Amino acid sequence: MILAMISWGASWPAAKIVGQYANPQDLIVWRFAFALVAMLIVMKIFNIPLTFPAKSLKFVVSASMLILIYNYNYLKGTQVGQSGLGGVIVPTLSPLLTFVFSVLFLKNKLQSKESIGLVVGLIGAVLLVRAWEMNANTVISSGNIYFLLGATVWAGATIFTQKASFELHPINFSFWVYGIAMLFALPVFPIDALTAIFSYDWIFWINFILISMIALGLGTTAYFITTMRLGSGKASSFMFIVPFSAVISSSIFLGEVIALTTVIGGIFAIMAVYIINK
């Protein structure tokens, strides 16, 4: 599980490297395809049936649309912005947004400690995106808009995942979500991108396999298996590894300078998630 979370963190600078070769719309379908292959292998090893989500199909389709939007923002954000910052914003803010959505749409009650956690999380968010410097141009050019949208749609996908959990094994659910998302992406998939990917060098392929088969396919699978064995509370605590892995790997491989506000904001966001889940 620790290796899976490290791979999630390392996938952020890897996505930036991949973004130097092609645009998001050229890569999304292939990313889903490689992840599906990895999931099929895992499902075969663990004898997980490929059950069609008949009863929860509307939740699967809804989650698929959000996952497609998330992957575009993930690839576009890392292409134009700092991958290390994205690797802090998305993993730390998405659990907070998931909690907010669960209160709004699932009618979960808000307790006092959870209110404190949300305030702490808001402070963290302000520091992460350096809200005092924000205007329309800097939000887009910095890539922060894509990271914020990514965190939001990932939280929405998590809500639909919870609604579908009664019918499907988590890995089976992920397979159908990514599979349907791939179908949704096909209409905007350029024809020349079908073969262009095979002309890229080994640097591209190492990083692309990391963000698709390892991080998206095997990493997600490891997370779900740990969730089933340890429970969602303990499993989610491993997510705290992701921001630090993203920051360190972005600094090592891309030479990104991580701002102090990113570190402090990430700590505040992690504290908020801890307070809410305590």
Predicted regions mapped to residue ranges:
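Helix-helix packing/entry segments at the starts of transmembrane helices
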Residues: 28-30, 72, 85-93, 160-183, ...
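Hydrophobic alpha-helical transmembrane segments of multi-pass integral membrane proteins
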Residues: 26-41, 45, 57, 61, ...
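Specific transmembrane alpha-helical segments of multi-pass solute transporters/efflux pumps
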Residues: 7, 11-12, 40-90, 127, ...
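Glycine-/small-residue-enriched transmembrane alpha-helix faces in small-molecule transporters
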Residues: 1-26, 69, 73, 136-163
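Hydrophobic/aromatic residues within transmembrane alpha-helices
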Residues: 18, 27, 31, 77, ...
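Membrane-interface helix termini and inter-helical loops of multi-pass transporters
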Residues: 13-21, 76-79, 83, 129-142, ...
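Hydrophobic transmembrane alpha-helices of multi-pass small-molecule transport proteins
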Residues: 39, 61, 113-132, 185, ...
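C-terminal transmembrane-helix exit sites in multi-pass transporters
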Residues: 41-47, 94-119, 244-264
